[in-house]
A protein has these predicted regions:
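Hydrophobic, aromatic-rich transmembrane alpha-helices
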Residues: 18-22, 308-355
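Transmembrane-helix signature of polytopic, membrane-embedded enzymes
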Residues: 123, 140-162, 358-359
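Membrane-interface alpha helices of multi-pass inner-membrane proteins
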Residues: 168, 194, 202-225
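Short acidic/glycine- and proline-prone juxtamembrane loop motifs at membrane-interface regions
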Residues: 171-178
Length: 435
Protein backbone atom coordinates (compact mmCIF):
# COMPACT_ATOMS: atom_id res chain seq x y z
CA UNK A 1 0.00 0.00 0.00
CA UNK A 2 1.25 3.50 -0.78
CA UNK A 3 2.56 5.75 1.99
CA UNK A 4 -0.34 8.21 1.55
CA UNK A 5 -2.95 5.50 2.13
CA UNK A 6 -1.03 4.14 5.12
CA UNK A 7 -1.06 7.59 6.74
CA UNK A 8 -4.73 8.01 5.86
CA UNK A 9 -5.56 4.68 7.51
CA UNK A 10 -3.64 5.59 10.66
CA UNK A 11 -5.45 8.94 10.88
CA UNK A 12 -8.84 7.21 10.48
CA UNK A 13 -8.11 4.71 13.26
CA UNK A 14 -6.47 7.07 15.77
CA UNK A 15 -9.01 9.81 15.06
CA UNK A 16 -11.96 7.49 15.65
CA UNK A 17 -10.76 5.99 18.92
CA UNK A 18 -9.37 9.24 20.30
CA UNK A 19 -12.46 11.34 19.53
CA UNK A 20 -14.92 8.60 20.51
CA UNK A 21 -13.21 8.05 23.86
CA UNK A 22 -12.92 11.74 24.72
CA UNK A 23 -16.45 12.66 23.64
CA UNK A 24 -17.98 9.64 25.39
CA UNK A 25 -16.47 10.89 28.63
CA UNK A 26 -17.22 14.59 28.16
CA UNK A 27 -20.76 14.21 26.78
CA UNK A 28 -22.11 11.38 28.92
CA UNK A 29 -23.72 13.58 31.60
CA UNK A 30 -24.65 16.74 29.69
CA UNK A 31 -28.36 17.51 29.02
CA UNK A 32 -29.85 15.71 26.02
CA UNK A 33 -30.52 18.89 24.03
CA UNK A 34 -26.93 20.04 24.46
CA UNK A 35 -25.68 16.56 23.60
CA UNK A 36 -27.68 16.50 20.36
CA UNK A 37 -26.34 19.93 19.38
CA UNK A 38 -22.75 18.83 19.97
CA UNK A 39 -23.44 15.59 18.14
CA UNK A 40 -25.04 17.12 15.06
CA UNK A 41 -22.58 19.96 14.54
CA UNK A 42 -19.55 17.75 15.18
CA UNK A 43 -20.84 15.26 12.62
CA UNK A 44 -21.68 18.02 10.15
CA UNK A 45 -18.32 19.75 10.55
CA UNK A 46 -16.36 16.55 9.93
CA UNK A 47 -18.45 15.67 6.90
CA UNK A 48 -18.24 19.12 5.33
CA UNK A 49 -14.47 19.10 5.84
CA UNK A 50 -14.22 15.69 4.17
CA UNK A 51 -16.40 16.80 1.24
CA UNK A 52 -14.10 19.75 0.53
CA UNK A 53 -10.90 17.79 1.18
CA UNK A 54 -11.88 14.85 -1.04
CA UNK A 55 -13.04 17.22 -3.80
CA UNK A 56 -9.57 18.78 -3.90
CA UNK A 57 -7.74 15.47 -3.37
CA UNK A 58 -9.52 13.65 -6.18
CA UNK A 59 -9.18 16.60 -8.55
CA UNK A 60 -5.42 16.68 -7.99
CA UNK A 61 -4.99 12.90 -8.32
CA UNK A 62 -7.53 11.92 -10.99
CA UNK A 63 -8.06 15.17 -12.88
CA UNK A 64 -11.77 15.20 -11.99
CA UNK A 65 -13.56 15.55 -8.61
CA UNK A 66 -14.50 11.86 -8.66
CA UNK A 67 -12.92 8.85 -7.00
CA UNK A 68 -10.39 6.50 -8.59
CA UNK A 69 -11.90 4.34 -11.35
CA UNK A 70 -15.21 6.17 -10.94
CA UNK A 71 -18.08 4.22 -12.45
CA UNK A 72 -21.41 4.48 -10.66
CA UNK A 73 -20.80 8.01 -9.42
CA UNK A 74 -20.12 9.33 -12.92
CA UNK A 75 -23.21 7.54 -14.22
CA UNK A 76 -25.38 9.08 -11.47
CA UNK A 77 -23.99 12.52 -12.25
CA UNK A 78 -24.43 12.23 -16.01
CA UNK A 79 -27.96 10.86 -15.66
CA UNK A 80 -28.98 13.69 -13.33
CA UNK A 81 -27.51 16.36 -15.60
CA UNK A 82 -29.24 14.75 -18.58
CA UNK A 83 -32.56 15.01 -16.74
CA UNK A 84 -32.03 18.58 -15.59
CA UNK A 85 -34.09 20.25 -18.32
CA UNK A 86 -36.91 17.68 -18.21
CA UNK A 87 -40.09 18.15 -16.22
CA UNK A 88 -40.43 16.31 -12.93
CA UNK A 89 -43.20 14.13 -14.38
CA UNK A 90 -40.98 13.23 -17.35
CA UNK A 91 -38.12 12.28 -15.04
CA UNK A 92 -40.51 10.17 -12.96
CA UNK A 93 -41.84 8.34 -16.00
CA UNK A 94 -38.33 7.78 -17.34
CA UNK A 95 -37.03 6.30 -14.08
CA UNK A 96 -40.03 4.47 -12.65
CA UNK A 97 -42.22 3.65 -15.65
CA UNK A 98 -40.04 3.27 -18.73
CA UNK A 99 -37.11 1.50 -17.06
CA UNK A 100 -37.29 -2.17 -16.09
CA UNK A 101 -35.50 -1.89 -12.73
CA UNK A 102 -36.37 0.05 -9.60
CA UNK A 103 -33.02 -0.10 -7.79
CA UNK A 104 -30.97 3.11 -8.22
CA UNK A 105 -33.95 4.99 -9.67
CA UNK A 106 -34.59 6.76 -6.37
CA UNK A 107 -31.11 8.25 -6.13
CA UNK A 108 -31.05 9.37 -9.76
CA UNK A 109 -34.44 11.04 -9.24
CA UNK A 110 -33.09 12.81 -6.14
CA UNK A 111 -29.95 14.01 -7.95
CA UNK A 112 -32.04 15.14 -10.91
CA UNK A 113 -34.07 17.37 -8.59
CA UNK A 114 -30.88 18.81 -7.09
CA UNK A 115 -29.50 19.46 -10.57
CA UNK A 116 -32.52 21.68 -11.24
CA UNK A 117 -31.48 23.78 -8.25
CA UNK A 118 -27.67 23.70 -8.43
CA UNK A 119 -27.10 23.03 -12.13
CA UNK A 120 -23.94 21.08 -12.96
CA UNK A 121 -22.28 21.93 -9.66
CA UNK A 122 -20.77 18.82 -8.07
CA UNK A 123 -19.94 20.17 -4.62
CA UNK A 124 -23.41 21.33 -3.52
CA UNK A 125 -25.17 17.92 -3.77
CA UNK A 126 -22.39 16.41 -1.67
CA UNK A 127 -22.83 19.12 0.96
CA UNK A 128 -26.56 18.34 1.03
CA UNK A 129 -25.70 14.68 1.53
CA UNK A 130 -23.41 15.71 4.40
CA UNK A 131 -26.41 17.33 6.10
CA UNK A 132 -28.41 14.13 5.67
CA UNK A 133 -25.49 12.14 7.07
CA UNK A 134 -25.25 14.35 10.16
CA UNK A 135 -29.00 13.97 10.68
CA UNK A 136 -28.54 10.21 10.45
CA UNK A 137 -26.33 10.35 13.54
CA UNK A 138 -29.09 12.09 15.53
CA UNK A 139 -31.73 9.60 14.38
CA UNK A 140 -29.41 6.75 15.30
CA UNK A 141 -29.20 8.11 18.84
CA UNK A 142 -33.00 8.11 19.15
CA UNK A 143 -33.23 4.57 17.80
CA UNK A 144 -30.43 3.28 20.02
CA UNK A 145 -31.73 5.02 23.15
CA UNK A 146 -35.10 3.33 22.71
CA UNK A 147 -33.52 -0.11 22.29
CA UNK A 148 -30.48 -0.19 24.59
CA UNK A 149 -30.90 2.78 26.94
CA UNK A 150 -29.44 6.26 27.31
CA UNK A 151 -25.84 5.25 27.94
CA UNK A 152 -25.70 2.87 24.99
CA UNK A 153 -27.57 5.34 22.80
CA UNK A 154 -24.98 8.05 23.36
CA UNK A 155 -22.09 5.68 22.73
CA UNK A 156 -23.67 4.43 19.49
CA UNK A 157 -24.32 7.98 18.26
CA UNK A 158 -20.76 9.06 19.05
CA UNK A 159 -19.46 6.02 17.17
CA UNK A 160 -21.60 7.01 14.18
CA UNK A 161 -20.40 10.61 14.38
CA UNK A 162 -16.73 9.65 14.02
CA UNK A 163 -17.02 6.38 12.07
CA UNK A 164 -14.71 6.68 9.02
CA UNK A 165 -16.97 4.66 6.72
CA UNK A 166 -19.94 6.94 7.43
CA UNK A 167 -17.81 10.01 6.68
CA UNK A 168 -16.03 8.68 3.61
CA UNK A 169 -19.03 8.42 1.27
CA UNK A 170 -20.00 12.05 1.74
CA UNK A 171 -17.06 12.90 -0.50
CA UNK A 172 -18.36 10.74 -3.35
CA UNK A 173 -21.24 11.20 -5.78
CA UNK A 174 -22.68 7.85 -4.67
CA UNK A 175 -26.00 6.99 -3.04
CA UNK A 176 -24.63 5.54 0.20
CA UNK A 177 -24.94 8.63 2.44
CA UNK A 178 -28.56 9.28 1.54
CA UNK A 179 -29.35 5.56 1.61
CA UNK A 180 -28.01 5.28 5.16
CA UNK A 181 -30.19 8.22 6.17
CA UNK A 182 -33.26 6.46 4.75
CA UNK A 183 -32.34 3.20 6.50
CA UNK A 184 -31.93 4.79 9.92
CA UNK A 185 -34.98 7.03 9.43
CA UNK A 186 -37.08 3.97 8.56
CA UNK A 187 -35.75 1.93 11.49
CA UNK A 188 -36.31 4.81 13.91
CA UNK A 189 -39.86 5.59 12.75
CA UNK A 190 -40.91 1.94 12.43
CA UNK A 191 -39.45 1.14 15.86
CA UNK A 192 -41.34 4.09 17.31
CA UNK A 193 -44.53 2.78 15.69
CA UNK A 194 -43.99 -0.68 17.14
CA UNK A 195 -43.39 0.62 20.67
CA UNK A 196 -45.90 3.46 20.88
CA UNK A 197 -49.24 2.94 22.61
CA UNK A 198 -51.04 5.25 20.21
CA UNK A 199 -50.54 5.71 16.50
CA UNK A 200 -51.93 7.84 13.71
CA UNK A 201 -52.20 7.74 9.95
CA UNK A 202 -48.98 9.75 9.67
CA UNK A 203 -47.07 7.41 12.00
CA UNK A 204 -48.01 4.50 9.72
CA UNK A 205 -47.62 6.22 6.36
CA UNK A 206 -44.13 7.63 7.07
CA UNK A 207 -42.33 4.30 7.66
CA UNK A 208 -44.31 2.79 4.77
CA UNK A 209 -43.08 5.59 2.50
CA UNK A 210 -39.51 5.17 3.73
CA UNK A 211 -39.46 1.42 3.12
CA UNK A 212 -40.83 1.88 -0.39
CA UNK A 213 -38.09 4.45 -0.98
CA UNK A 214 -35.48 1.91 0.16
CA UNK A 215 -36.61 -0.40 -2.63
CA UNK A 216 -35.69 2.35 -5.11
CA UNK A 217 -32.15 2.51 -3.72
CA UNK A 218 -31.38 -1.19 -3.27
CA UNK A 219 -34.15 -3.74 -3.57
CA UNK A 220 -32.68 -6.18 -1.06
CA UNK A 221 -32.65 -3.41 1.55
CA UNK A 222 -36.39 -2.94 1.17
CA UNK A 223 -36.93 -6.68 1.48
CA UNK A 224 -34.81 -6.82 4.66
CA UNK A 225 -36.72 -3.86 6.10
CA UNK A 226 -40.10 -5.52 5.53
CA UNK A 227 -38.78 -8.82 6.93
CA UNK A 228 -37.55 -7.04 10.07
CA UNK A 229 -40.90 -5.35 10.63
CA UNK A 230 -42.84 -8.60 10.31
CA UNK A 231 -40.32 -10.42 12.53
CA UNK A 232 -40.71 -7.79 15.24
CA UNK A 233 -44.49 -8.12 15.07
CA UNK A 234 -44.24 -11.86 15.55
CA UNK A 235 -41.58 -12.05 18.28
CA UNK A 236 -41.66 -8.80 20.28
CA UNK A 237 -43.10 -9.15 23.79
CA UNK A 238 -46.77 -8.30 24.25
CA UNK A 239 -45.70 -5.75 26.89
CA UNK A 240 -44.23 -3.74 24.02
CA UNK A 241 -46.77 -4.59 21.30
CA UNK A 242 -50.32 -5.39 22.43
CA UNK A 243 -52.20 -8.22 20.74
CA UNK A 244 -54.77 -5.90 19.14
CA UNK A 245 -52.08 -3.65 17.74
CA UNK A 246 -50.09 -6.69 16.62
CA UNK A 247 -53.10 -8.00 14.67
CA UNK A 248 -53.74 -4.65 12.97
CA UNK A 249 -50.11 -4.15 12.00
CA UNK A 250 -49.74 -7.71 10.72
CA UNK A 251 -52.86 -7.18 8.61
CA UNK A 252 -51.32 -4.03 7.20
CA UNK A 253 -48.06 -5.89 6.53
CA UNK A 254 -49.88 -8.67 4.67
CA UNK A 255 -51.77 -6.10 2.60
CA UNK A 256 -48.52 -4.32 1.74
CA UNK A 257 -46.89 -7.63 0.78
CA UNK A 258 -49.75 -8.48 -1.57
CA UNK A 259 -49.52 -5.00 -3.08
CA UNK A 260 -45.83 -5.49 -3.85
CA UNK A 261 -46.21 -9.09 -5.06
CA UNK A 262 -46.04 -9.40 -8.81
CA UNK A 263 -44.46 -5.99 -9.27
CA UNK A 264 -41.00 -5.03 -10.46
CA UNK A 265 -39.69 -4.77 -6.90
CA UNK A 266 -40.39 -8.38 -6.00
CA UNK A 267 -39.04 -9.56 -9.34
CA UNK A 268 -35.76 -7.77 -8.65
CA UNK A 269 -35.46 -9.28 -5.16
CA UNK A 270 -36.22 -12.74 -6.53
CA UNK A 271 -33.62 -12.27 -9.23
CA UNK A 272 -31.03 -11.14 -6.70
CA UNK A 273 -31.61 -14.23 -4.57
CA UNK A 274 -31.78 -16.63 -7.51
CA UNK A 275 -28.53 -15.26 -8.95
CA UNK A 276 -26.55 -15.46 -5.71
CA UNK A 277 -24.70 -18.62 -6.77
CA UNK A 278 -23.96 -17.06 -10.15
CA UNK A 279 -22.63 -13.93 -8.42
CA UNK A 280 -20.29 -16.00 -6.28
CA UNK A 281 -19.12 -18.12 -9.21
CA UNK A 282 -18.56 -15.14 -11.53
CA UNK A 283 -16.62 -13.26 -8.86
CA UNK A 284 -14.50 -16.32 -8.16
CA UNK A 285 -13.78 -16.86 -11.85
CA UNK A 286 -12.89 -13.19 -12.32
CA UNK A 287 -10.47 -13.26 -9.39
CA UNK A 288 -8.92 -16.50 -10.65
CA UNK A 289 -8.42 -14.96 -14.08
CA UNK A 290 -6.57 -12.09 -12.38
CA UNK A 291 -4.23 -14.54 -10.70
CA UNK A 292 -6.12 -14.99 -7.43
CA UNK A 293 -5.70 -18.75 -7.10
CA UNK A 294 -7.17 -18.85 -3.59
CA UNK A 295 -10.45 -17.19 -4.55
CA UNK A 296 -12.22 -20.56 -4.50
CA UNK A 297 -11.88 -20.64 -0.70
CA UNK A 298 -13.63 -17.27 -0.19
CA UNK A 299 -17.14 -18.69 -0.52
CA UNK A 300 -20.32 -17.43 1.08
CA UNK A 301 -20.38 -20.46 3.37
CA UNK A 302 -16.96 -19.55 4.73
CA UNK A 303 -17.49 -15.79 4.96
CA UNK A 304 -21.12 -15.63 6.18
CA UNK A 305 -20.34 -16.55 9.82
CA UNK A 306 -18.03 -13.51 9.97
CA UNK A 307 -20.65 -11.03 8.75
CA UNK A 308 -20.47 -8.99 11.99
CA UNK A 309 -16.72 -8.47 11.51
CA UNK A 310 -16.30 -8.07 7.74
CA UNK A 311 -14.96 -6.46 5.63
CA UNK A 312 -11.25 -6.93 6.24
CA UNK A 313 -9.00 -3.93 5.53
CA UNK A 314 -7.17 -3.82 2.20
CA UNK A 315 -3.47 -3.36 2.98
CA UNK A 316 -2.06 -4.73 -0.27
CA UNK A 317 -1.32 -2.34 -3.13
CA UNK A 318 -3.60 -3.77 -5.82
CA UNK A 319 -4.42 -1.88 -9.01
CA UNK A 320 -7.97 -0.48 -9.19
CA UNK A 321 -8.47 -0.88 -5.41
CA UNK A 322 -7.33 2.58 -4.36
CA UNK A 323 -10.72 3.48 -2.88
CA UNK A 324 -10.63 0.36 -0.70
CA UNK A 325 -7.14 1.30 0.46
CA UNK A 326 -8.34 4.79 1.40
CA UNK A 327 -10.97 3.36 3.75
CA UNK A 328 -8.84 0.51 5.12
CA UNK A 329 -8.61 2.26 8.49
CA UNK A 330 -12.39 2.37 8.75
CA UNK A 331 -12.60 -1.35 8.03
CA UNK A 332 -10.05 -2.00 10.78
CA UNK A 333 -12.28 -0.07 13.19
CA UNK A 334 -15.24 -2.21 12.08
CA UNK A 335 -13.23 -5.37 12.74
CA UNK A 336 -12.35 -4.16 16.23
CA UNK A 337 -15.94 -3.19 17.11
CA UNK A 338 -17.05 -6.61 15.89
CA UNK A 339 -15.84 -8.08 19.19
CA UNK A 340 -18.36 -5.97 21.12
CA UNK A 341 -21.07 -6.93 18.63
CA UNK A 342 -20.39 -10.59 19.38
CA UNK A 343 -20.74 -9.90 23.12
CA UNK A 344 -24.07 -8.14 22.51
CA UNK A 345 -25.45 -10.97 20.35
CA UNK A 346 -24.35 -13.67 22.79
CA UNK A 347 -25.79 -11.78 25.75
CA UNK A 348 -29.13 -11.08 24.06
CA UNK A 349 -29.52 -14.74 23.11
CA UNK A 350 -28.17 -16.56 26.16
CA UNK A 351 -27.58 -14.27 29.18
CA UNK A 352 -30.06 -11.39 29.41
CA UNK A 353 -32.28 -13.17 26.85
CA UNK A 354 -33.85 -9.87 25.80
CA UNK A 355 -33.54 -10.68 22.09
CA UNK A 356 -37.29 -10.27 21.60
CA UNK A 357 -37.10 -6.57 22.43
CA UNK A 358 -34.20 -6.22 19.99
CA UNK A 359 -35.80 -8.37 17.30
CA UNK A 360 -36.58 -5.47 14.96
CA UNK A 361 -33.10 -4.02 14.49
CA UNK A 362 -31.52 -7.45 14.96
CA UNK A 363 -33.56 -9.16 12.26
CA UNK A 364 -32.86 -6.31 9.85
CA UNK A 365 -29.09 -6.60 10.14
CA UNK A 366 -29.21 -10.42 10.18
CA UNK A 367 -31.37 -10.51 7.05
CA UNK A 368 -29.45 -7.93 5.04
CA UNK A 369 -25.91 -9.00 5.95
CA UNK A 370 -26.90 -12.65 5.60
CA UNK A 371 -28.14 -12.13 2.03
CA UNK A 372 -25.09 -10.08 1.07
CA UNK A 373 -22.66 -12.55 2.65
CA UNK A 374 -23.93 -15.50 0.61
CA UNK A 375 -24.35 -13.51 -2.60
CA UNK A 376 -20.76 -13.01 -3.67
CA UNK A 377 -20.21 -9.65 -1.91
CA UNK A 378 -19.10 -10.93 1.49
CA UNK A 379 -16.01 -8.67 1.71
CA UNK A 380 -17.41 -5.75 -0.28
CA UNK A 381 -17.32 -2.74 2.04
CA UNK A 382 -19.86 -0.86 -0.04
CA UNK A 383 -22.42 -3.68 -0.02
CA UNK A 384 -21.94 -4.33 3.71
CA UNK A 385 -22.23 -0.63 4.62
CA UNK A 386 -26.06 -0.54 5.11
CA UNK A 387 -25.73 -2.87 8.08
CA UNK A 388 -23.18 -0.64 9.83
CA UNK A 389 -25.58 1.66 11.76
CA UNK A 390 -27.22 -1.28 13.53
CA UNK A 391 -23.82 -2.89 14.15
CA UNK A 392 -22.73 0.33 15.89
CA UNK A 393 -25.79 0.07 18.14
CA UNK A 394 -24.93 -3.54 18.92
CA UNK A 395 -21.29 -2.64 19.60
CA UNK A 396 -22.39 0.12 21.98
CA UNK A 397 -24.70 -2.35 23.72
CA UNK A 398 -21.81 -4.78 24.05
CA UNK A 399 -19.71 -2.06 25.70
CA UNK A 400 -22.44 -1.35 28.27
CA UNK A 401 -22.43 -5.07 29.12
CA UNK A 402 -18.69 -5.27 29.76
CA UNK A 403 -17.64 -7.03 32.95
CA UNK A 404 -14.54 -8.81 34.20
CA UNK A 405 -15.56 -12.06 32.50
CA UNK A 406 -16.31 -10.87 28.97
CA UNK A 407 -13.53 -8.28 29.07
CA UNK A 408 -11.11 -11.21 28.96
CA UNK A 409 -12.56 -12.02 25.55
CA UNK A 410 -12.02 -8.42 24.39
CA UNK A 411 -8.37 -8.53 25.47
CA UNK A 412 -7.97 -11.61 23.28
CA UNK A 413 -9.89 -9.85 20.52
CA UNK A 414 -7.30 -7.04 20.63
CA UNK A 415 -4.85 -9.57 19.18
CA UNK A 416 -7.27 -11.38 16.88
CA UNK A 417 -8.07 -8.25 14.85
CA UNK A 418 -4.51 -7.44 13.68
CA UNK A 419 -3.90 -11.15 13.05
CA UNK A 420 -6.99 -11.26 10.81
CA UNK A 421 -5.81 -8.15 8.96
CA UNK A 422 -2.35 -9.61 8.34
CA UNK A 423 -3.85 -12.98 7.38
CA UNK A 424 -6.10 -11.28 4.82
CA UNK A 425 -3.12 -9.42 3.36
CA UNK A 426 -1.19 -12.72 3.26
CA UNK A 427 -4.15 -14.31 1.49
CA UNK A 428 -4.24 -11.55 -1.14
CA UNK A 429 -0.50 -11.68 -1.74
CA UNK A 430 -0.32 -15.47 -1.88
CA UNK A 431 -3.34 -15.79 -4.11
CA UNK A 432 -1.58 -13.59 -6.66
CA UNK A 433 1.67 -15.53 -6.47
CA UNK A 434 3.57 -12.60 -4.97
CA UNK A 435 5.56 -14.68 -2.48
Amino acid sequence: MSFVFIIMGIVWVIGFFLLSTQCSQKWKDIPEKKFLNYLFFSALGLRVFWVVFSYIYYTLNTGIPFEFSAGDSLWYYEESIGNRDSSISSIWNYLFVDTTTVSDSGYVFYLSLLSKIFGENILYPRLVNACFSATTVVLLYKLAKRNIGEEGGRIAAIFACFMPNLIFYNGLHLKESLMLFLIVAYLERADNLLRSKKYSIVSIILPAFLVLTLFTFRTVLGAAAVFAFVTALVFTNTSVIGNKKRFMLISWGVLAAFTLTGGTIVNEVDGYLEDRETNVENKRNTQTAKGNQWAKYATGTVMAPMMFVLPFPTMVDVDEQYNQQMISGGNYVRNFLGGFVLIAVFSALFITKNWRNLSFIGSFVFAYLGIVSVSGFSNSERFLLPGLPVLLIMAAYGITLLNAKNYRFIKIWYWIVPVMAVAWAYFKLGSRGLF
